[in-house]
A protein has these predicted regions:
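Rossmann-like AdoMet
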Residues: 14-79, 97-126, 130
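A short acidic, Gly/Pro-enriched loop at the edge of an enzyme's catalytic core
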Residues: 168-176
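Core SAM-dependent methyltransferase catalytic element
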Residues: 231-246
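Conserved beta-strand signature within the Rossmann-like core of class I S-adenosyl-L-methionine
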Residues: 206-213
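Glycine-rich SAM-binding Motif I of class I
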Residues: 89-93
Length: 246
């Protein structure tokens, strides 16, 4: 059952991050827990004026952009998947539930520079909203140890990598990429030509990359990296999105 939006809950947390140059910088951030149009939660970062998901529906956006436009386009029974931006773990949860139902084997790699605190994760309603009988799986995704493979189920192995994908070696033989960084105008360093070249090189022939973004500059950058790129209908509230194929 969906519910009405209430006053946002504000969480403050002190995050120590690596700039990539062996320096440590303490950043004080606020993340506001908000309810989107489909009843599912998202997080809002006031300092960036940016949401983790579409306010028109977090679950609907994730399902449309990554599951329907990406995962469902693969006929393979064994899938190697790379996500740029683990975030709230919503994409991972939807992928786990979808592939378990279809008896597929998934190795799920995901980069995240700013992992969420478990105390905040436990407030998110995805598990109870999407699959109440399997709600614990969502928490299991977040409790999984970083920087090593963890079998969440016999058919779903999660390998979360804490760090910057721009400065990291990417896993190889990838079939599907979920590109879910913050928007280009908020996090431009994540949409540079080098990252798309690295992604192209790590993917198998016929591999698919999907993202919610449909900006012309992003499409051109993907094409320059070697991808065949198409604009396809976007999720509720967004006319278009991009799908790229190697």
């Amino acid at each position: 059952m969906y519910f009405c939006a209430k006053k946002p809950i504000i969480f403050k947390e002190l995050i120590t991050m690596s700039t990539g140059y062996n320096e440590k910088q303490a950043i004080f951030t606020e993340r506001e827990l908000q309810v989107t149009a489909d009843g599912s939660h998202t997080l809002f970062v006031p300092s960036m004026d940016e949401h983790y998901h579409s306010v028109n529906g977090a679950v609907q956006e994730s399902a449309h952009v990554f599951i329907e436009a990406g995962l469902h386009q693969l006929a393979k029974k064994e899938i190697r998947l790379l996500e740029i931006g683990f975030g709230t773990g919503l994409n991972a949860l939807l992928t786990l539930l979808d592939t378990e139902e279809k008896e597929k084997m998934v190795t799920y790699y995901s980069f995240e520079l700013y992992p969420l605190e478990l105390s905040l994760v436990e407030k998110l309603n995805y598990g109870k909203l999407i699959s109440p009988g399997q709600a614990d799986l969502f928490i299991d995704l977040h409790r999984a140890t970083w920087n090593e493979p963890v079998a969440i189920t016999p058919a779903f192995t999660l390998h979360k990598m804490e760090g910057d994908s721009n400065r990291s070696t990417l896993p190889q033989n990838i079939d599907l990429v979920y590109f879910d960084a913050f928007a280009p105008d908020k996090q431009p360093e994540m949409w540079n030509p080098e990252i798309f070249k690295k992604l192209y090189e790590c993917m198998n022939e016929g591999g698919i990359l999907t993202t919610y973004c449909a900006k012309g500059v992003v499409r051109r950058t993907m094409k320059e990296a070697g991808f065949s790129v198409e604009r396809i209908p976007g999720p509720p509230g967004k006319r278009e999105m991009l799908r790229a194929v190697k």
